[in-house]
């Protein structure tokens, strides 16, 4: 039946069909977590962009949680730790339980576990991070980081509600090479939330970041106020594979505006000086913020002092010699491994992602919906990602070769 086609044409068909096939497409699934983020990335410039996410400013309603996240939660063995109650900024547990004991291990009581990132190894390594972005002052901070060639040396723990209301600022950080991580959706005391609410706070922030960053799934999160215990740790790790990042020193830059009677730019800088210009050699993982002009001013004043005193600045992942994202190695242009909507593996070419955000109307070969009826697809890794399911590639190659062989025989 192929006799009317020329040998050259059939040979070309074989080459074309075989060309997209790469061994990397046949690798095992990178992580079960990648299956939890299946929606095609909406266009942040589209008028309906916000409709793809829960409302900013409050914990997402449980009804918005994709069923896949809840199913994963059901498989996680959680410790017997009660939900805490907020009490003047300090979570308390029922029956006067001690939040510092090993079973609860609340960082509010300065308890941390081996898996937490607390203080980086190595001498004079400053693990640079900023919480609470993006804000109005974030673009100026990102400009300063770029001017000093340290954009990729900073981790930004971002708030989900801020991400979706200021996506262009996030894209600036991505394009500059900043390392993005999770700071929850609405900045609550996490130990006071139910298991499902914890999932919503983390998962939706991860989704928003992944959508903007080419499908790169965050690997790190920092609890607001440092409020984390073993129950919350277990959910973050068990459901989403997240690593909990704490701090070994609080700069109190946040308090300049919150507690002006106790803290000022000068007093915070004076404390900062003791850390970066003194005799300390142990690595630093500081609590810093991109909240307002005061917090940015403190950093811009102290950074040159630290460098002059021999400190090397690295983002959190690099400071601990770990990869940047759950499904990608180092940088915002490394290869991304994700799951397609059909549950098959695709590998994207390295690309800067700020110019390749997928359309909100992108189509897919199958449909998966969350509990709120929202269509979910894989987080788009790049517009250059192949749209053919990997399961079809070997068979297409065999078919093409068969056609060529048939032509020869004819």
Swiss-Prot record:
The active site is at 131 (proton acceptor), 289 (proton donor). Residues 19-39, 386-410 form a propeptide. It comes from the Eukaryota. Its main location: membrane. It is found in: Cell membrane. Co(2+) binds at residues 132, 183, 187. Hydrolyzes the N-acetamido groups of N-acetyl-D-glucosamine residues in chitin to form chitosan and acetate. Chitosan is required to anchor melanin to the cell wall, for maintenance of cell wall integrity, and for proper cytokinesis. Chitosan offers an advantage during infection as it is less readily detected than chitin by host immunosurveillance mechanisms. This is Chitin deacetylase 3. It comes from Cryptococcus neoformans var. neoformans serotype D (strain B-3501A).
């Amino acid at each position: 039946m192929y006799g009317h086609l020329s040998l050259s044409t059939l040979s070309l068909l074989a080459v074309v069909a075989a060309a997209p096939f790469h061994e990397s497409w046949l690798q095992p699934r990178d992580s079960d977590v990648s299956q939890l983020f299946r929606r095609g990335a909406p266009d942040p410039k589209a008028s309906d962009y916000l409709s793809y996410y829960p409302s900013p400013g409050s914990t997402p309603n449980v009804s918005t949680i994709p069923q896949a996240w809840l199913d994963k939660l059901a498989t996680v063995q959680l410790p017997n730790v009660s939900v805490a109650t907020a009490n003047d900024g300090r979570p308390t547990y029922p029956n006067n339980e001690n939040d510092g004991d090993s079973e609860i291990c609340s960082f509010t009581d300065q308890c941390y576990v081996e898996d937490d990132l607390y203080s980086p190894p190595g001498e004079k390594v400053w693990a640079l991070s900023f919480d609470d972005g993006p804000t109005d002052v974030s673009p100026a901070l990102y400009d300063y980081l770029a001017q000093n060639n340290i954009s990729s040396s900073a981790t930004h723990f971002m708030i989900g509600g801020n991400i979706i209301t200021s996506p262009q600022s996030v894209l600036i950080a991505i394009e500059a090479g900043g390392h993005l991580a999770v700071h929850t959706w609405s900045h609550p005391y996490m130990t006071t939330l139910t298991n499902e609410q914890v999932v919503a706070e983390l998962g939706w922030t991860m989704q928003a970041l992944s959508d903007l960053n080419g499908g790169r799934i965050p690997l790190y999160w920092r609890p607001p106020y440092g409020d984390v215990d073993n129950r919350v740790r277990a959910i973050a790790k068990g459901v989403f594979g997240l690593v909990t990042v704490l701090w070994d020193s609080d700069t109190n830059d946040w308090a300049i505006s919150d507690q002006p009677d106790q803290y000022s730019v000068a007093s915070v800088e004076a404390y900062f000086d003791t850390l970066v210009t003194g005799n300390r050699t142990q690595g630093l993982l500081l609590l810093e913020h991109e909240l307002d002009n005061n917090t940015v001013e403190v950093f811009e004043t102290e950074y040159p002092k630290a460098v002059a005193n021999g400190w090397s600045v690295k983002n959190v992942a690099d400071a601990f010699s770990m990869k940047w994202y759950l499904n990608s190695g180092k940088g915002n242009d490394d290869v991304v491994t994700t799951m397609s909507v059909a549950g098959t593996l695709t590998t994207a070419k390295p690309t800067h992602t700020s110019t390749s955000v997928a359309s909100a109307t992108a189509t897919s070969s199958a449909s998966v919906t969350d509990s709120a009826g929202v269509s979910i697809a894989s987080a788009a890794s790049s517009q250059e990602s192949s749209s053919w399911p990997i399961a079809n590639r070997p068979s297409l190659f065999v078919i093409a070769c068969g056609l060529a062989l048939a032509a020869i025989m004819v």
